[in-house]
Structures are given as C-alpha cells and as structure tokens.
Amino acid sequence: MAGRGKLIAVIGDEDTVTGFLLGGIGELNKNRHPNFLVVEKDTTINEIEDTFRQFLNRDDIGIILINQYIAEMVRHALDAHQRSIPAVLEIPSKEHPYDAAKDSILRRARGMFTAEDLR
C-alpha cells in the first residue's frame, strides 16, 4: 500500500490562506499543528520566520507556498533554505502582484539550467 503523500503548507494573508483552505489543503499533524499561517498586521516577523522554519522541519510537508510580499520580510530565511524538499514557491496576493525579479528561488533555479537544457 502506498504511503501518505506530502502536504502543502501556506503562509499568507487571510484571502490567500482562506482560498487554499477552501480548496482542501488544511491539515493538522499528529501534534495538532496546522499547515498554514494567516499573516495579519499584528503578526511579527519572528512568528512568520518561526512558522516557516517549523514547516521546513516537518517531514509531512512537501511544498510551502508563501505570499511574495511576506517572503520579502523573511528573505534571509528563504535564501538559507537549500534543500529541494520542501519546495518553496512564492505566490502573489490580491494586493501584491508577483514580481519575478524579487523571487530569489526562481533566480537560483534559472542558474541551474543553460539555454541548451531548455530546448
């Protein structure tokens, strides 16, 4: 029998997280820790960074989605993440469009391939 798949975690504003929760990604692990964080105006950078690091260390999470404007707040933590799993993807929010120039993970991925590799 196949094992359980990996979860998607999300760190974002209320609209983003609610959308993903309505899509069915919300889970609690065996320790009753959720796989999401709603970032509000009173959420501290330390809370965001701690949650991000907790998601990195959970073996049940395969992908972490984070609003790009929130990723900017903890860029040093994202840049320090070198493993391929969990994959970290920066996504837009309703108020903040995606800017590929700010996505350090995308820049790193682009450096892994040459133009020949993509033909």
UniProtKB/Swiss-Prot annotation:
Subcellular location per the Swiss-Prot or TrEMBL entry: Cytoplasmic vesicle, Secretory vesicle, Synaptic vesicle membrane; Cytoplasmic vesicle, Clathrin-coated vesicle membrane
Biological-process GO terms, alphabetical: pH reduction; proton transmembrane transport
Expressed in which tissues: Expressed in brain (at protein level).
Xref: InterPro entries: ATPase_V1-cplx_f_g_su, ATPase_V1-cplx_fsu_euk, ATPase_V1_fsu_sf
Topological type in the membrane: Peripheral membrane protein
UniProt-recorded Gene Ontology molecular function terms: proton-transporting ATPase activity, rotational mechanism
Keyword flag Membrane: yes
Keyword Transport among UniProt keywords: yes
SUPFAM superfamilies cross-referenced by the UniProt entry: AtpF-like (SSF159468)
CC annotations in GO: clathrin-coated vesicle membrane; membrane; synaptic vesicle membrane; vacuolar proton-transporting V-type ATPase, V1 domain
Signal peptide: none
Keywords attached to this entry: Cytoplasmic vesicle, Hydrogen ion transport, Ion transport, Membrane, Synapse, Transport
Disulphide-bonded residues: none
Role noted for this protein: Subunit of the V1 complex of vacuolar(H+)-ATPase (V-ATPase), a multisubunit enzyme composed of a peripheral complex (V1) that hydrolyzes ATP and a membrane integral complex (V0) that translocates protons. V-ATPase is responsible for acidifying and maintaining the pH of intracellular compartments and in some cell types, is targeted to the plasma membrane, where it is responsible for acidifying the extracellular environment.
PANTHER family (alphabetical): V-TYPE PROTON ATPASE SUBUNIT F (PTHR13861:SF2), VACUOLAR ATP SYNTHASE SUBUNIT F (PTHR13861)
Subunit field text: V-ATPase is a heteromultimeric enzyme made up of two complexes: the ATP-hydrolytic V1 complex and the proton translocation V0 complex. The V1 complex consists of three catalytic AB heterodimers that form a heterohexamer, three peripheral stalks each consisting of EG heterodimers, one central rotor including subunits D and F, and the regulatory subunits C and H. The proton translocation complex V0 consists of the proton transport subunit a, a ring of proteolipid subunits c9c'', rotary subunit d, subunits e and f, and the accessory subunits ATP6AP1/Ac45 and ATP6AP2/PRR.
Family: Belongs to the V-ATPase F subunit family.
The protein's name: V-type proton ATPase subunit F
Lineage: Eukaryota, Metazoa, Chordata, Craniata, Vertebrata
Gene: ATP6V1F
